[in-house]
UniProtKB/Swiss-Prot annotation:
Gene behind this protein: CDO1
UniProt keyword list: Dioxygenase, Iron, Metal-binding, Oxidoreductase, Thioether bond
GO molecular function, one term: cysteine dioxygenase activity
UniProt-listed InterPro entries: CDO_1, RmlC-like_jellyroll, RmlC_Cupin_sf
Residue numbers binding Fe cation: 86, 88, 140
Protein name: Cysteine dioxygenase type 1
Lineage: Eukaryota, Metazoa, Chordata, Craniata, Vertebrata
Length: 200
């Protein structure tokens, strides 16, 4: 039996084209998508136009809408920026590092009682690594723990979603939050609210 070779995207545009092919059907091959995203070697000249930072919090910048099958976006993390603990609304979530490092902390789903949430693991994601999570794996928080270097990550969500739940680590209490885009296709979104952007 032949071993299928991982296509190596030469550019970000190439990666997007391959992702469109991979998501053309109804099934998602998680391992294949993760391998393709990891195989792309980050080149800032290809993604800099999407990398729009905010002084106070991380930003979500839409790159491609994946024919309705997925959203591809670039998240920009200033020094010390981080997300809340959150779920992924029954979607697949792929996170590939383009620049810098991010710390991912994985949590178990809270039980019904008001107890502190249980930390399952933590790891540091480095440039060109690609991680995967879905709701059956657990919840996570992502943080740029550097106080000197920004971080940039490429995220794919399938199917796309615009709300999720953010969790209080001390009690497990959850709130529904709506995510907005800081920019779309390299253009700053007018009136993007900075209040309830919680997702990555």
């Amino acid at each position: 039996m032949e071993q299928t070779e991982v296509l190596k995207p030469r550019t970000l545009a190439d990666l997007i084209r391959i992702l469109h092919q991979l998501f053309a059907g109804d099934e998602v091959n998680v391992e294949e998508v993760q391998a393709i995203m990891e195989a792309y070697e980050s080149d800032p000249t290809e993604w800099a136009m999407y990398a729009k930072f905010d002084q106070y919090r991380y930003t979500r910048n839409l790159v491609d809408q994946g024919n309705g099958k997925f959203n591809l976006m670039i998240l920009c993390w200033g020094e010390g920026h981080g997300s809340s603990i959150h779920d992924h609304t029954n979607s697949h979530c792929f996170l590939k590092m383009l620049q810098g490092n991010l710390k991912e902390t994985l949590f178990a789903w809270p039980d019904k009682k008001s107890n502190e949430m249980v930390k399952k693991s933590e790891r540091v994601l480095r440039e060109n690594q690609c991680a995967y999570i879905n709701d059956s794996i657990g919840l996570h928080r992502v943080e740029n723990i550097s106080h000197t270097e920004p971080a940039v990550s490429l995220h794919l969500y399938s199917p796309p979603f615009d709300t999720c739940h953010a969790f209080d680590q001390r009690t497990g209490h959850k709130n529904k939050v709506t995510m907005t885009f800081h920019s779309k296709f390299g253009i700053r979104t007018p009136n993007a609210t900075s209040g309830s952007l919680e997702n990555n």
